Each structure stands twice: as structure tokens, then as C-alpha cells.
Amino acid sequence: MNSKADVIAVSTGRAAYPQDKSRWFAAVKRKRLRLVFAFYSPDGNEIAMPIASMSAYLKRDFPWVDVILEAVLILRDADKYSPENYAKTIQELDADIIAFSIMSPHWYPMEPYFEQIKKLMPNLPVVIGGYQSMLSQQQTIENPNVDFICVGDGEYAIGNIVQHLKGLKPGPVDGMWEKLVDGEVYETEPHQIGDLAALPFPDYDVFAKADGFDDVNSSIFGPKGVLVLPVMTGRGCPYRCTYCCNTPLLETWKTKKTFLRKYDPEDMVDELIRLRDLYNVGYFEFWDELFLSNLKFVRAFFEIYKQKIHLPFSINSRVEVMNEKFCQTAAEAGCHTIWFGIESGDEEFRAKMLGRKMTNQQVLDAAANCKQAGINRLTFNIVGTPLETAENMRQTLRLNQEIAPEHFFFFPYIPLRGTPLYNIAKKEGLLLENKKELHYLSAANDRHFTLNMKECPQLLTAVEYDEICRQMLAFQEANNRLSYTDGVAPEVEPARVEDKSFSLVDADNSSASNSGQDRPIESAIAIVHKQEKSLFAGVRNLFRS
């Protein structure tokens, strides 16, 4: 294993690696290895930060690897990016390996792509990374068209696999699981890279087209007419929201402290200056899971950014830390928009079911502090969560109407494997087991809203869900006015996010795991069971304001 990479859990009883059963060791004979990175883009975004980081690492430490990007950009051309035609494109690239970075909701629509690739190129190893392989290891490796999965941080792991394919590094591919010729799976431990300074900054050239970035869609919410470049100042989030994939990852990390990793502020600003000047960047979007995970870093960063960068930017934040001083400091540094999650307008439901313990007054105060500082507000809200009632949804709408953020955004709940809320949904029999093709954000475009779980008429009927979502959509179209020009009123135009189709199915009938994170939620449900004969009627009462 790379000495710079720690492991999440050290195995003491791992069997010796049966190298004679590896189909891929020393399989690449030519001098230069051709590696294709891929990701699924159903929303139009064409930047993937994990790929940018792995590409930079490969280009620095393995110059004999040709790094190629061929993303699945289905919004650009559905026919060109169909599974059959995409596989033909990969065949034309003459690749030695293809590595997909996949989010969990995109797993099912991507499976036909793996199948078509293996039909055309049975000797091309397929590697899966991203949250899908980190959270759903067994489901991912069991796909007959998958050869390796990356189960942790991917930079050193991708370096290990290219050496494996060239026969330069005997032994297993540390940081990955490998499917052997006899069908057995050889497992290694996930990598956690604690020292980000040991890695190069992400490589954006991998996303450029023939005309540079003129035709690269790098942002969904950012301004048009300038290059909006997504950047990250670190990795990790200290919070344990029950619906978020970060929570099970945090639970497996060695310590909470090492899970939160930041670049040095001076180094980060120097990199932003380089990017600004190299690509003529007009706006930075900070894609950190939580920009404020280290307040000491934030204070230092804002001061240096203000002095050296002089570009507007947006960040993700939490209402608990958005006091007057913070918002004013952020505004002085150039912060244009703060994205923050409200998720639900019902305080009790939000705390007990979603793990978000802020009060509505904190939400209102944070929004007011932003407005006073001249910062735009973009709110995230989830609808259709397990055991949510119609009244819960109405409270979400009312709270946002009271705030009147510059951009109101709502989306259907997505059950993510391994998360506490997924486990509760599964335990209560709410997961859809047969229907794979669902919509994520495209519902707003289609004017048709359907639950991503089974209907609970005692709590929220399908008709009520559609009706309230339509009310939210009407508010969104009347309210949203996010502007990127100074002193110029924005053109009024209905907010529209391109299709984000995704698939959701739970083929695993095994019982949900009961992690420690489930206990607060299960306690709430247990109370309901005691108080009411009907779970759903009880939850209606428990979370009703």
C-alpha cells in the first residue's frame, strides 16, 4: 500500500493474494497505458471533482498513463450517449481500462453501459468508484460486468491499479476489491488520505474541449456568460444528517478529526490565483460538503481571498454558524451566494427524522443576516422523506415563503444505502422494490411529481404530494430572482433545472442494519408505536406542530 495512505480498518486475517487468479495482472503490454475516466451526468454538469483529483495524481506520478475523459452526457445527445453508442465510442478510444465515478442514484441507469462495454470489449477491465462503491460494496462488485471497485479515496488506488495492469507492482490492488477468475472477490481496505498536501491540486484540463471551456457546462446555479469553476478547499463534513451519504462514511473513518481535511489557506489561494489567470475564471463555486467545517481555516481564507482574488464566489453553509459577523466577513471577501439546507419547515420532524437540530428561529436569523450583508440566499429543501406528512411539507413551503430567498430549491428525497434514513425506510417497508426508473429534478420540468417511496395515505397521499409540490413550484417560479449583475434587475424567467433522471430499486431483501445513528429515529418511532396502534397515525401526531 502507498505509505502516504492510511486505511480505515487494518485487516489482520486477510488471506494471501492469489496472483495466479488475477485476470488483469500484467495484462497491458504496450509502453503507454490508456485510461478512460467516465461519469454519468443527467443534470448537465460536466465537472467531476474526484476525476479531476485522480487525473492530476496520475499525470504527476505516472506520466506513462494517457488520461482520457469520456463522460456520459445524456442531455447533450441522448442517442450519442446511449449505452450501445457509448460503448462504441470507448472501443474507438482503444482503452486499456475504464474507470467510472458513480453516485448511488445513478447506479441503475449506468448498468446497461457496463453490459454493452463488456459485450464489445470483454478484455477491458471495468472499475467502479464513487459513493456507489463506497456505500454499496457488495451490490457493486456483484455486477457481472464489474472487475474492480474502489472502496475509499481513489488517488492512490488508481495509481495502484495502473501499476497492477502493467505488472509493475505484484500483489493486490490496495484500496480496491478485485473479482478473480474463479469469481471470488479479493478485498483490501479503503484508503483514507489525510494529508491533502501530498496530492496535486485537481486537474481541470481533463474536462476541456477543443475550444477550451467555452462549451463546458461547469455549473447549474452559477452565472451565465463567465466561466464558473467549481473548487474544493478540503474534504469531509462533521455532521451526521440522516439522509446524507457522508454519515456512513464518517462512521467508518478512524477519527472525526482526520475525516475533516483542509488545504493550507495560502496554498489554496495561490491555486485559485493560478486557476483564475489560466482559465479566465469569473466566479468560483466552493463545492466542499461544508465550507465551514474548520472556522479557523475560514477566517484565514476569507482574509487572504479578499486581498488576492477579487472574484465573487458561493459556498455551502449551515445556519448555526451564519451569524452577523460571519456573513459580513464573507460578504467583504466577495461571497455572492450562500447555499444552505432547511430541508423541512417542521422543527421536530427535521430534528428527529433528518438529524438537523437547528430551530426555525435560527433559520430565519441566518437568512436575515445574509440579506443584511448583501449575500444572496439559496435554500435546499427535501420533500417526500420517510414518514413525512402533508402538513410537514406545507410548513416547509411556509418557512421558505417567510424567508423569500433569492433562490428556493426543492427536490424529492433519495434513499441512499447505508444512511440511517434509508435503513428506517427499509425497516418500515417503504422502499420501492420493482420500479427502477424515477425522476429526481426533472419533475419540476414535467409538472408531475411522484413519490420515490411507497405511498402512506395516513400521512401523505400521492395526490397531496403532487399538489403541494405544485404549490412549491409556483412559489419557486414567482419568487426566484437570483442575479449576478450589480444594479441590474434580473430577467424574470421560470427556474428550470435540466432532467436528472435516476433509478432506485432495492433488490436486497436482507434486513437493514441497525447502526448507532438509527437510535434517535427508532426511539421516536418506538414512542409512536406505544402511543398509537397505527404507526403512521402516530407519526402524524408526533411531528405535527
Question: What are the residue ranges of the model-derived segments?
Answer:
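C-terminal accessory regions of radical SAM enzymes
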Residues: 2-45, 177-181, 185, 192, ...
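Structural motif
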Residues: 34, 96-97, 283
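Short hydrophobic segments within beta-strands
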Residues: 36-41, 70, 101, 129, ...
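A short, glycine/small-residue-rich beta-strand->loop->alpha-helix junction that serves as a flexible
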Residues: 41-49, 102-107
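Glycine-rich beta-alpha loop elements in corrinoid/cobalamin-binding modules
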Residues: 57-61, 65-193, 412-418
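Conserved strand-turn element in the central/C-terminal portion of the radical SAM core barrel
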Residues: 77, 290, 318, 345-355, ...
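Catalytic cores of alpha/beta
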Residues: 139-142, 326, 387-401
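Radical SAM [4Fe-4S] cluster-binding motif and immediate context
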Residues: 197, 204-380, 398
